[in-house]
Amino acid sequence: MAFQKAVKGTILVGGGALATVLGLSPFAHYRRKQVSLAYVEAAGYLTEPVNREPPSREAQLMTLKNTPEFDILVIGGGATGCGCALDAVTRGLKTALVERDDFSSGTSSRSTKLIHGGVRYLQKAIMNLDVEQYRMVKEALHERANLLEIAPHLSAPLPIMLPLYKWWQLPYYWVGIKMYDLVAGSQCLKSSYVLSKSRALEHFPMLQKDKLVGAIVYYDGQHNDARMNLAIALTAARYGAATANYMEVVSLLKKTDPETGKERVSGARCKDVLTGQEFDVRAKCVINASGPFTDSVRKMDDKNVVPICQPSAGVHIVMPGYYSPENMGLLDPATSDGRVIFFLPWEKMTIAGTTDTPTDVTHHPIPSEEDINFILNEVRNYLSSDVEVRRGDVLAAWSGIRPLVTDPKSADTQSISRNHVVDISDSGLITIAGGKWTTYRSMAEDTVDAAVKFHNLNAGPSRTVGLFLQGGKDWSPTLYIRLVQDYGLESEVAQHLAKTYGDKAFEVAKMASVTGKRWPVVGVRLVSEFPYIEAEVKYGIKEYACTAVDMISRRTRLAFLNVQAAEEALPRIVELMGRELNWSELRKQEELETATRFLYYEMGYKSRTEQLTDSTEISLLPSDIDRYKKRFHKFDEDEKGFITIVDVQRVLESINVQMDENTLHEILCEVDLNKNGQVELHEFLQLMSAVQKGRVSGSRLAILMKTAEENLDRRVPIPVDRSCGGL
């Protein structure tokens, strides 16, 4: 076995060397292409944005209605679709984009939040001497560097630790990671390095210590995916593209080409989802960039077309920030079933994922309990046994549909393409499918190149390399200090605004409400534990937010960070949006219900509430569960599913017990796993299970609730020393 591993390592080293040598010949064309692109960017003329601010949605709809014919109409408002619109409009093409939901409402907002070259692809490229895989990695690393440059406020390098538990893995993975640095060349973010066992545990104290021999740390990029997607859309709008969300394509328009006599796609019949109004948008070329819905649009063109999309669901979960170091991620390269799991800090929380399961295409993917538990089990395997990973620690969960594709022009139509595919139908519909977030720009460039060539459009080369996205041009790491000094914002809020809006953060700050406090002067928070402020709701409407779901999931990221916090903020968000958009009381109620449904099904709330008595982590007899539920509901009169300080105070007052708020707060915090000021039923059941199993000696809250229950039945006062005595 050891010999086998040694051979593997030798192959990796030899393959790496061979790939490096081969890079001088088969990859020379690719390198020349990159050099050529860089030269075009240096010498070409980049037009300034035609709009200082993105036009309103109403103005964009008027442009869509009144323009006789666009050069390009893009269907789909994800990263690739918005990238196509930006690429086309900056070439001087008259461009339109329509999206049936919100920008980034699908897969593009449900990623792992990484901007990466693909370490796994490089491993396959070297082991199999696969030129295509190498090209993919090389291209992705080039795009990674560009994305970090054009949106510095939304992205940053992130060190990722690869813990190793066998000695042979150290040289094996070290060579592979060093090859990753080598392929990146001058665009390498930072050089990878090896950590000893003790140093690895210093960085990641919760790591499984047994048999740990050391770790390797390498660098990739991380970003705020939905905000990045939105920045691309807003930049395209500022450059003159007519972009509109909530515009559904009902059918494709066609006309006969007078030269060939063939039918050509000439636009689309579009429906405003918010008003129901329909109208035609005509274009010389239509680009299908609809992600998982690729085949739905292709069937509008040709109902007999062979499907190319093979959808796969990837589930992620969010856990409290203390599960990972603040500035370092972790990679499990070989899970129990051969998948790869990332464990990453993001927005002061921890993201864990992903899974890879065949699925059906749907507008509302739901994370399954099976996938959530798979991720939790993998997390448990990598963390010390001292750390109890609980189902209740999952603050949010989501499923994104990866649009994996087969190449219709390939001889083997069943094999999934590892790269993106640009397909042109007989009627001229351009379809871009596959690929990954990191390479959205090069995918867009290839797509518009194909459109220009096939439809004989008058356009120059792509100009998007180095083109700053909305908010990036005048951003600096110290910009937040000016926000604190000039507007009187909290430092945490100012840092959040600078990271989210870049140089546009000042516009948000100007909208901030006065708090009425000595400090901060302005910036009323939507929820106390997150730095989102009310002014962001007003500004979000300028960024084309049309619904409460848009606001909690893509303008802010509350839904992706903590579903309960998002639910808590919803009434105020709906009130603020209703004021700005003149919503009726009925519309406000509908928005509240729709957003609550979104949190319940799509963001993991349903899975969470259904697992309150999951036997895998609560080992109580059914009779005990019933008894403890009854005790819990003595405090939770409204059947909310959780109790707060107010609930405890109410019960104590009813039995004539006085206790100061600070003591009560301390008692609840002992059990409050999510640190959200609430103790949920499953948290209480976990506590009682732990008490029975002897994992904890007792709990002040457990004693308090037991004593209160007894006295509520007997209606006699509880002695103060019993209610809050130490254990």
Curated annotation (Swiss-Prot):
Recorded catalytic activity of this chain's protein: a quinone + sn-glycerol 3-phosphate = dihydroxyacetone phosphate + a quinol
Residues annotated for Ca(2+) binding in this entry: 672, 674, 676, 678, 683
Domain EF-hand: 623-658, 659-694
The UniProt record lists the keyword Cell cycle: no
A biological-process GO annotation: glycerol-3-phosphate metabolic process
Enzyme class name: oxidoreductase
Pathway as given in its UniProt record: Polyol metabolism; glycerol degradation via glycerol kinase pathway; glycerone phosphate from sn-glycerol 3-phosphate (anaerobic route): step 1/1
Cofactor: FAD
Coarse class of the protein's main subcellular location: mitochondrion
SMART domains (UniProt xref): EFh (SM00054)
Entry's localization field: Mitochondrion inner membrane
Transit sequence range: 1-42
Family note: Belongs to the FAD-dependent glycerol-3-phosphate dehydrogenase family.
Protein name: Glycerol-3-phosphate dehydrogenase, mitochondrial
Organism: Mus musculus (Mouse)
Gene that encodes it: Gpd2
